[in-house]
From Swiss-Prot:
One of its GO terms (biological process) is iron ion transport. This is Ferritin-1 heavy chain. The keyword Zinc-finger does not apply. It comes from Schistosoma mansoni. The lineage of its organism: Eukaryota, Metazoa, Spiralia, Lophotrochozoa, Platyhelminthes. Its EC number is 1.16.3.1. The gene is SCM-1. One of its GO terms (cellular component) is cytoplasm.
Length: 173
């Protein structure tokens, strides 16, 4: 038993381990998206950079949760990371729509985690999840929604290429 553990329920600890897996899974999916757009037959460097950045952000979220788990006296239990459901996308629009769906799943998981903390009256736990994660999730969902709206507006082909260059700042490597 950890010396620093206080009011940290086993259900909160298990929930953090589950969320670590969710964040690593999201990182894995975003990395798959990034390297799809980096392929020579897709060549949308802005999408590549955007999704690579999202992958790193999700990985950092997992690391922050692992640090928190240790700080509260919990134990990190890593689980297998599921393979992404797909390996390629027909367009940037479809990838952004999948990214929005993923962010909503992560957000739902975080909200369920807060509910666990509330059930066990762990205010520190709830504050941590609310302050470090939920606001960022809402911002990500808004950004992706805006991107989807604009990708629908500009269409495939030249519109998608222009979005890649102008909005995502894709440049030739």
């Amino acid at each position: 038993m950890s010396l620093c553990r206080q009011n940290y329920h086993e259900e909160c600890e298990a929930g953090v381990n589950k969320q670590i897996n969710m964040e690593l899974y999201a990182s894995y999916v975003y990395m798959t998206m990034a390297f799809h757009f980096n392929r020579d037959d897709v060549a949308l460097n802005g999408f590549y950079k955007f999704f690579l950045n999202e992958s790193e952000e999700e990985r950092q979220h997992a690391i922050k949760l692992m640090t928190y788990q240790n700080m509260r006296g919990g134990r990190i239990v890593l689980q297998d990371i599921s393979a992404p459901p797909q390996l390629s996308w027909n367009s940037g629009l479809h990838a952004m729509q999948d990214a929005l769906d993923l962010e909503k799943k992560v957000n739902q998981s975080l909200m369920e985690l807060v509910a666990v903390g509330e059930r066990h009256r762990d205010t520190h736990f709830c504050d941590f999840i609310n302050n470090e994660y939920l606001e960022i999730q809402v911002q990500s969902m808004k950004k992706l929604s805006d991107y989807i709206t604009n990708l629908i507006r500009v269409g495939n082909g030249l519109g998608e290429y222009t979005f890649d260059k102008e909005t995502l700042h894709g440049e030739s490597q």
